[in-house]
Regions:
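A solvent-exposed, acidic/Ser-Thr-rich amphipathic alpha-helical stretch
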Residues: 23-77
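Short beta-strand segments that buttress and anchor functional surface loops
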Residues: 84-91
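Short loop/turn motifs at secondary-structure junctions and domain boundaries
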Residues: 17, 65-66, 92-94
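Short, solvent-exposed coil/turn segments at beta-strand boundaries
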Residues: 33, 77-82, 102-110
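Short, low-complexity N-terminal intrinsically disordered segments enriched in polar/charged residues
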Residues: 1-28, 32-33, 121
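Ligand-binding pocket scaffold of soluble enzyme catalytic domains
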Residues: 72, 80, 92
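Short beta-strand edge/turn micro-motifs at domain boundaries
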Residues: 95-121
């Protein structure tokens, strides 16, 4: 692959496996050297929470096992970026909504940046 060739990112494929709760298939969309950044009430922009591929996998498995319903909407992809809105609905009715930006390299997600808000308990 030369420098001008880009691998197209299948955001709709990611949406399908994400909403189906197929964690192993979701993780195939990610680079193993992922940088995951989360900004929320407990982790402001000046001090965001950061994690890696393994942590993301554990979080997704926990969501699937905990009965959390996941939706991915407003998907867009182009060039070396993709974005979406993710909604997680917890069994108690609370919701988390995240605006997510994916940075891509060679068709894989290398950085995921989430700005999220959760219903109060």
């Amino acid at each position: 692959m030369n420098a001008t060739t880009q691998t197209r990112f299948d955001i709709e494929g990611l949406k399908r496996v994400f909403e189906a709760g197929d964690v192993d298939k979701v993780l195939e969309f990610y680079s193993e050297d992922l940088e995951h950044i989360e900004i929320d009430a407990g982790a402001p922009p000046s001090s965001p929470r950061t994690s890696d591929f393994e942590h993301l996998g554990n979080a997704l498995r926990g969501a699937a096992q905990g009965g959390i319903k996941l939706r991915m909407e407003n998907t867009v992809a182009g060039g070396n970026r993709a974005a979406c809105t993710i909604t997680c609905e917890f069994p108690d009715g609370r919701r988390l909504v995240s605006n997510t930006i994916y940075d891509l390299k060679d068709g894989k997600i290398v950085r995921q940046s989430d700005v999220q808000v959760t219903d109060p308990e």
